[in-house]
Amino acid sequence: MAAEGRVQRVASELQKVISLLLRTKIKDSKLATATITEVELSKDLSYAKVYYTCLDIQEAQYISKAFEKSKGFFRSSIAKSLNLRIVPNLKFVYDKSLDYGMEMEGKIQQALEADSKIIKQDDNSLQENYKDSDKETKVEKLR
């Protein structure tokens, strides 16, 4: 249990350090636009999957290659920042959850629009039915 807590703490620190490096030390403006969303660390702290996302999907492939080229820089900077016996091997993975979330949001918006159209149609038909029944009531009163 204690080891899991340490793994999570180190993963959190790795995320902070890599994010800080992206903001302050990376000169590649496209790579600097990437956001680190999560870091998964192996139990022995030797491997880390670093999940990232970027606002421009067309830049994802470029950013992936840039991360691969910059692995050594990130590892050496992590070694200087964190007091770890072993600096984990980094694997950068594009995080598709943001894209998936935006896709789901679009589908929800479409469903809400379709529902509002149906509700408007139902309201209109109810109003027409009410008007028709109101006319019939008036005619019956006249008889």
Swiss-Prot record:
UniProt keyword annotation of Cytoplasm present: yes
Keywords: Cytoplasm, Ribosome biogenesis
Stretch forming the signal peptide: none
InterPro entries, A to Z: KH_dom-like_a/b, RbfA, RbfA_dom_sf, Ribosome-bd_factorA_CS
Region annotation Disordered: where it falls in the sequence: 123-143
Keyword Cytoplasm attached: yes
Chief localisation class: cytoplasm
GO MF annotation, one: ribosomal small subunit binding
Gene Ontology, cellular component aspect: cytosol
Pfam families reported in the protein's UniProt record: RBFA
Compartments (UniProt record): Cytoplasm
Biological process terms in GO annotation: maturation of SSU-rRNA
Top-level taxon: Bacteria
Similarity section: Belongs to the RbfA family.
UniProt subunit comment: Monomer. Binds 30S ribosomal subunits, but not 50S ribosomal subunits or 70S ribosomes.
NCBIfam families noted in UniProt: rbfA (TIGR00082)
Protein function: One of several proteins that assist in the late maturation steps of the functional core of the 30S ribosomal subunit. Associates with free 30S ribosomal subunits (but not with 30S subunits that are part of 70S ribosomes or polysomes). Required for efficient processing of 16S rRNA. May interact with the 5'-terminal helix region of 16S rRNA.
Protein name: Ribosome-binding factor A
Organism placement in taxonomy: Bacteria, Pseudomonadati, Pseudomonadota, Gammaproteobacteria, Thiotrichales
